[in-house]
Amino acid sequence: MLYQQIASNKRKTVYVMIGFAILVLFIGAAVGYVFYDSAMAGIIMAAVIAAIYMAMMIANSTNVVMGMNHATEISEADHPEIWHIVEDMALVANIPMPKVYIVNDASPNAFATGNSPKNAAVAVTTGILERLNREELEGVIGHEVSHIRNYDIRLSTIALALSSAIAMLVNIGMRSFWWGGGRRRNDNDNEGGSLEIVMMIISIVLVILGPIATTIAQLALSRNREYLADASSVELTRNPLGLIHALQKISVSEPMKEADPSSAALYISDPFKKKRTMAHLFDTHPPIEDRIQRLERM
């Protein structure tokens, strides 16, 4: 079952890559049509921006994400306990030892990033080291190592890169509008007026709703991966109580100060403790109570 899920995640990586790429091009076309009077110019601009973001994130995702979250790489001598826990969990999961980072934040939390198990990294906050015991830390690290083993981190990296590209496209379009750009037509350019209006409306709606749809899709992927990582952590530690108690402590902690908003979905729990939405569409994580209930049934 687990190996089937890993294979499924690899396929999802391809699907997400294709889907996001298509969405980027459509939004680029809409931005070009509305603000520059040329859908093709928008598509070219979108392709260039997306390619740059993808290259940056895939080639240097660990450094980029760790930098955004103010994380510092450590050695075994700096924090031997957490270092050895990461080492042990990686050994059990049969993956290379990830790099280990520390985020100087009193709120307990952790995340994993990278492009593949060969260049992955795990980050923990100072707060999680102070508040969790060894069994609870093993549950948390087992969860993060599972993200690495299941190739969730690659999916996250691609989604984050292309979401950033979409945000940049919309930003460019809006700045162009405020700086005096925008679509202009001559008074005698009235041929196909009805079609022109329809295309303009569709383009504007796409520019407005495209980033929202992207966010919803990205967060849905994140929520589904959390359940799998929880289950995989128990497979590694053989101790569901460790992760249960860790989640309980994390759920009642204060919001983080050092977390980057665009990386929120990477963390084991929402670092900003935002109020849950009615339909959970904009939640970065599934409810902790639901995760605990699933763990209790194992």
UniProtKB/Swiss-Prot annotation:
Active site per the UniProt annotation: 144
Q: Topology with regard to the membrane?
A: Multi-pass membrane protein
Chief place of localization: membrane
Q: What is its EC number?
A: 3.4.24.-
Q: Which InterPro entries match?
A: HtpX_protease, Pept_M48_protease_HtpX, Peptidase_M48
Task: Give the UniProt entry's GO cellular component terms.
Answer: plasma membrane
Q: Which family does it belong to?
A: Belongs to the peptidase M48B family.
Protein name stated in the entry: Protease HtpX homolog
According to its UniProt entry, this protein's organism is Pediococcus pentosaceus (strain ATCC 25745 / CCUG 21536 / LMG 10740 / 183-1w)
Lineage, please? Bacteria, Bacillati, Bacillota, Bacilli, Lactobacillales
